[in-house]
Amino acid sequence: MITDTIYQQFGHLLNRSERLRTTVLVLANTAGCLLMLSPALSLIAATSSAIYIYNHNQGPLDWFMFECMLGVTAFSAYLTWQLLNIRPEQPEGIRLKPEQSPEIFEMLERRANHFRIKPVTHINLSTGTELKIVGTPVWAVPIYHRHTLCTGTPLLFFLGRGQFRLGLAGAVAVAANKRICLSGWLDQAANDWPLIISALKSNDSLLPRLLLKPIDWLATHIEHLSIRLRADWRQQQSRWVLDNSDEQNTTDYLASHLVATAFLDKQYWPMIFKAADRSPTPVVKAFSHLPLLLHKTLNKKHAERWLLEAQTFGKQQQTGVRDLLAELRIDHLAWPGLPAESAFDALFSNKEILKQLDTYWQNTIETQWRVAHTRYKNHEFRFNQLKKSAQEQGLRGESALKFVKLAPQFVDRQGAIAIYKEMYNNNADDAKVCFACGLALLRSSSVDAGITALQHAATLDPALAKRARVLVSEHRNAWVDEEPEHQTTTMEHATA
């Protein structure tokens, strides 16, 4: 009991004192480094001891100690060799060659020289929307790093050439600052430990079995203690952009970055993965078709809604956006639209690199795609069973709930609405089914029927009344999406 109280008080003190938190982080990261380097340190100590004893041998006992030191040296050398063969995973993506886009390499070299840092020679084109220099440990110790410029290919279609140059300069500036300050090393180490743990887990040798548990324990506490530190460093690039550019350029860059991320997560990838319903292997050319699909499916209304969500909703990754805008005294973000000439078109003379990225993405996503296809086929089989049962004898309880849940995947909106109403009428005495049908009707834009079903569910079970009121209120205040059938049809035509 006393120990728990002391632990809680120390935790509160850590939350209040940044200096204490930094001190604990330094100690924890140093302990982790020493633990990972323990085989090499033991090798040095045992070898030195063996040499000393050999040179000062005075009897049988010294010979025994010498032989013991030789054994410790051999064992330490074995563990050190295993340590050298544990390599954390490098950033995802395909390696860009200088001849594919010489201008990007020239930009990066000029910026590295300007900030007086070691040249970054590796550039990866990834499938995300990042634009940053990523340091990854060469070995399983967060000390020596290989630095790579990671550029999200989709982001290049949302930025103009000038915006890309501005973002690249900010990325190099952050990398330069991170190398010369203590908080930068702590942030880098906090990002390194998950990679090191993943490398230890994927290696079945003796050293990972000895070190995994203590390193995992340390990494868990380091991650918790460095939450604020990492959040602050995530915003350093945007702060640099504002300090070295005008407010309009900064807001345009931030808005384009947020819209690109939201477009991929909320619209593009769900639309692409619909093809898993038809094909067991990923045959869609997600990046070769991206420019066409981007102009066909993205509109101003969606972009403004995503920006509003980023500035108002409480997700952890979006909280930093609100804090940054408040710190920079920016009232709101407005999307400037897609550039007349994207950074990709300006920096790449041909689109051959997109075909390489298609192949890389298809190989990377193959397992996940196969799982999605299998899940769809299982759902399709279950839906057909429930549909047959509904026609023959009707559905009740859990079967009705499952039928309502699966309906949007296999019938159009009008067909789904008919199913929701049928299940509601057949289960008018079941609060859970009525609530599920009401929610599904609201999402299908059948507002009056949805509200009626939710109110009836609240009558059957008063515990659902508050949730029903919240859902109705949220729906009345929500932005209206385009019908998903339009997006699916667009993708099918474009990828045919």
Residue ranges and their predicted role:
Residues 177-212, 252-258:
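Post-HEXXH active-site segment of zinc metalloproteases
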Residues 27-51:
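Canonical alpha-helical transmembrane segments of integral membrane proteins
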Residues 83-192:
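Peri-catalytic and regulatory segments of divalent metal-dependent proteins
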Residues 78-96, 224-233:
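Transmembrane-cytosolic junction motif
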Residues 1-16, 206-230, 243, 247-448, ...:
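Cytosolic-facing loops and C-terminal tails of multi-pass membrane proteins
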Residues 61-90, 109:
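Transmembrane alpha-helices and immediately adjacent membrane-cytoplasm interface residues
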Residues 109-113, 169-177, 194, 229-250, ...:
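An active-site-proximal "capping" alpha-helix that borders the catalytic cofactor pocket
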Residues 44-72, 205:
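Hydrophobic alpha-helical transmembrane segments
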